[in-house]
């Protein structure tokens, strides 16, 4: 079917009255015709520094909405949009919509012309970047993205991907020559003492501008109508091809109405895979690029399963954030309505959190909570954004579905496959499905290519050869500070390799991480290169400290400066104001090439970074991270002292955050030892309260110290307590009657230096779990896989040895 994509006489006369050149209308017509014919998106960037650019966007978007409204019926008939989507949806996103703000003025200038031309069959949604959560899971035909003052790369990824094939994106931008030297609101958020806005770089803006000019499908005009980048030839009609028909299986367990909602073969396969979970328990792993309808399919299939089970069905839905599952919930709701249900929806801040209909219930829980709930089905959406230990908590569930984006603004990458699926295969068999056919837009969409390129969403590390592994074994590596100007300005492959290591090795990456590296004055990169130049370890550091006295005094009273995470913690939690004057490197992220893990490269990078810091006259190096056993052990074994542990677990990773420090200067050593001693004292008490559920194998490493000395902390026992300890170790009294006397002895052990009685791993875990965390004998016996009687005897034997050793110190 061929449709005419030409603005009518009324539009042309209106545009002429507003002094809009006919050539600009033709660029817009051509862009829309191309988008409709290819089922791709197209972008028009409007440069300018007055309200004219918003007015021009209003005219061009209004004219486009008018054309789309005329053909919406044909688009539904061709299965390019759902029958419920019978109105043209327009999204306007800007930094501010409050009265008297420039963002509001631009929006009003846009609406002044848009409302005249667009017609009544159009819905307009206006949001600020702070509220883009509300649009997730929705799809739009036209987007006006006001980037005149502020935006963050996260906003860019999130918003652009809501536009469907056949749609247009209008970018309101400053003149490029001016924009490349401008500071945005995002830049202001990067200022941290002792730096000023003058120190903030503009590398990311320049990269963005360059990518506008390099990629196909993007046209650039000025607010006065000058075309700086236009289509090679004009186009005023589009041949619209129907989406390929989907073959519905003759025999299905799920209602046919649900299969009729499927737009691609991939979605049908998801429904069939869910059918296999009706009669038997099982696990399904579903992966896809963005825009493939993955979450939509899971939402529909979950309802199919609930109906087919013919019983009260509870479904736990989890994802890194509630915003990640909005498509899933919306289509689950639509599926229920298709089947004649009247679903009840519970929302939180405009986002669906719970969905109920008769005997069916879907509810969202944070990843660290969901596995504790009883349910018939567990769905983990955007699973690559959930920390691996939490993913494993769901592995033994009877029916579980892991669903994940391989690329996209969540920044998942192949890390999900590398870090989780490999180990999951050893524990359980499961079915894997990969969805390839796009739903929101067709293959080869130029805007997707542009987005992936500008935000480095598909970056991957360099390939390693056998020769490379030999170099790694011999540690023929060197640490280098790359020239970030060169990386970003000249689009070096090294930048992609650097970011690619993080995408594969880290559980969560966001586009703003790249902009932070590009522009933050206190952030720098270091790379560990092989002799042949290949990057095998990526390190991102933040320079912290050197804070003026007046700011330190404010910090002590509660002020929290941006950045300076470690100095702020040392001032607030350890009252060591002088630490904030010292300078150091906070290691923001350190990751090794996934094919070169456990080969000592991370430790080598730390060794060389410490050497560099020493040569530069810095006082310390440190880091903050999710406290897993593996990571705490890594940092402690590299000579770092633990100085803080957060009181609550991260809701996504399920981990407490630890902060570690390694002194370089004499003054830093004195202060860090004080903080480490204080932390160890506090930790003996926290384990019975805020950290009672902390895994003992992690706790044992948090007690380790690089200083080798006992904490100067007086332990006092009365003469009666000493006699009762003698009676307990002599099998006269039971443990429960002498806890008050046992606990100080165990504290003494954990606060001691290196010259203390030897205990093996199991014995250390027993003391932490039973004595400091006060778990029951039953729970403690389960921990070491022994009987309660054996556990009681072992604890008595350990205490006997400790009491014999420390008795002489307490006389």
Swiss-Prot record:
Q: Which family does it belong to?
A: Belongs to the TmcA family.
Question: What does the record say about induction?
Answer: More highly expressed at 85 than 65 degrees Celsius (at protein level).
What does the UniProt entry say about where the protein is found?
Cytoplasm
Q: What class of enzyme is it?
A: transferase
What EC number(s) has UniProt assigned to this enzyme? 2.3.1.193
Q: What is this protein called?
A: tRNA(Met) cytidine acetyltransferase TmcA
The record's SUPFAM superfamilies line, in alphabetical order, gives: Acyl-CoA N-acyltransferases (Nat) (SSF55729), P-loop containing nucleoside triphosphate hydrolases (SSF52540)
| Organism per entry | Thermococcus kodakarensis (strain ATCC BAA-918 / JCM 12380 / KOD1)
Q: What cellular-component terms does GO give this entry?
A: cytoplasm
What CDD domains has UniProt attached to this entry? NAT_SF
UniProt GO MF annotations: 18S rRNA cytidine N-acetyltransferase activity; ATP binding; mRNA N-acetyltransferase activity; rRNA binding; tRNA binding; tRNA N4-acetyltransferase activity
Gene symbol?
tmcA
Its GO biological process annotations read: rRNA acetylation; rRNA acetylation involved in maturation of SSU-rRNA; tRNA acetylation; tRNA wobble cytosine modification
Binding of ATP occurs at 267, 440
Q: What does this protein do?
A: Catalyzes the formation of N(4)-acetylcytidine (ac(4)C) at the wobble position of tRNA(Met), by using acetyl-CoA as an acetyl donor and ATP (or GTP).
**InterPro entries tied to this protein:** Acyl_CoA_acyltransferase (IPR016181), GNAT_dom (IPR000182), NAT10/TcmA_helicase (IPR007807), P-loop_NTPase (IPR027417), TmcA/NAT10/Kre33 (IPR032672), TmcA_N (IPR013562), tRNA_acetyltr_TmcA (IPR024914)
Phenotype of the disrupted gene, per the record = Grows at 85 but not 93 degrees Celsius, loss of N(4)-acetylcytidine (ac(4)C) residues in tRNA, no change in thermostabiity of bulk tRNA. Complete loss of all ac(4)C in rRNA, tRNA, ncRNA and mRNA, decreased growth rate starting from 75 degrees Celsius, very slow to no growth at 95 degrees Celsius.
The family database entries (Gene3D superfamilies) matched by this protein are listed as: 3.40.50.11040, 3.40.630.30, P-loop containing nucleotide triphosphate hydrolases (3.40.50.300)
Domain named N-acetyltransferase is located at 474-663
Q: What is its main location?
A: cytoplasm
Q: Which Pfam families match?
A: GNAT_acetyltr_2, NAT10_TcmA_helicase, TmcA_N
* Keywords for the protein's UniProt record, in alphabetical order: Acyltransferase, ATP-binding, Cytoplasm, Nucleotide-binding, RNA-binding, rRNA processing, rRNA-binding, Transferase, tRNA processing, tRNA-binding
